[in-house]
């Protein structure tokens, strides 16, 4: 355990506390077991280390990575037992999906060590309610997104902007600080700002994240063969060159040499992993989601990384809107326009010259325009949807 402690100390020393992700103040840190899920590269590890560094006594805390060589000869339950006997109170386990029997052993730790507070992070691919060791009734779960435009401005440019609600956007109640130029950094955010990487070759780093997700995270979770993992990568390449598009599962299945049902499963894995977003129809009621109508890449930064020279600005705009809204509210395809939120608000997304033809006589219809700084009437600037968290 000495080496684990030494590694932990080194990571704490290297952790900056000058910027906090939106999730930092949303987590109930008093819960006995907390799970933080999210795509690779969005800052889960940094958030955990910041909390320990700022809020907890070092002697009561231990942070470990589930892939540490220590676990080649020790079980997670053994570590928890030893840590508890030493008076430990707060155990943090990073990238839990890399530990084979993670669900079973977390359940045992929860049941046998009431004195321990346990937090684990993992890939968004994981389903904690799956299998015999259901953690959903024990762990308080959170899902973390990549950077919003608001967070990007604070992290990389020192610009502070308050979080806005959808209602404020629709009612034109957003107060823009004096001197703030909302479009100055927006294009850069769309191209490279979703992931909190500040140095080096950003494009290469994102490609590494994508490769690790497809080649390691998803196959581990879904017990996929190497051949199927290759098909995942081919499917993502097809989506990157075509998104957004109405999926023809049979046609895609023919290209991948798998059944249409398998295509749907592969798309579900990519979506859970934070690589694509699937826009569905509504089948009665806000939560009644139907068939997939369109498939998008998850965020604009992925478009610029994976689509190469075939980047369409209209696709970037729609992807940004869908990405920034769907994690906090139900978003479905609109029968008359682009998007329907909460089953009642219709949004048409476009450029500065976008007309309102499709929204004439539509109650709760809004036009979302790129390249404008302020809104009026039912027109909302696109950048403002980056202020929701």
Label each region the model flagged.
Residues 1-26:
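N-terminal pre-Walker A segment at the start of P-loop NTPase domains
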Residues 2-10, 123, 130-236:
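Interdomain motor-coupling "hinge/lid" segment immediately C-terminal to the ATP-binding subdomain
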Residues 36:
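Hydrophobic anchor at the beta1->P-loop junction of P-loop NTPases
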Residues 44-45:
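Conserved lysine of the Walker
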Residues 58-90:
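Short glycine-rich substrate-engagement loop in P-loop NTPases that contacts/grips substrate
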Residues 92, 117-123:
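Structural recognition of the conserved hydrophobic beta-strand(s) that form the central parallel beta-sheet
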Residues 194-337:
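Accessory nucleic acid-recognition modules appended to NTPase machines
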Residues 321, 325, 339-353:
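Conserved catalytic cores of phosphodiester-cleaving nucleases, focusing on short active-site segments
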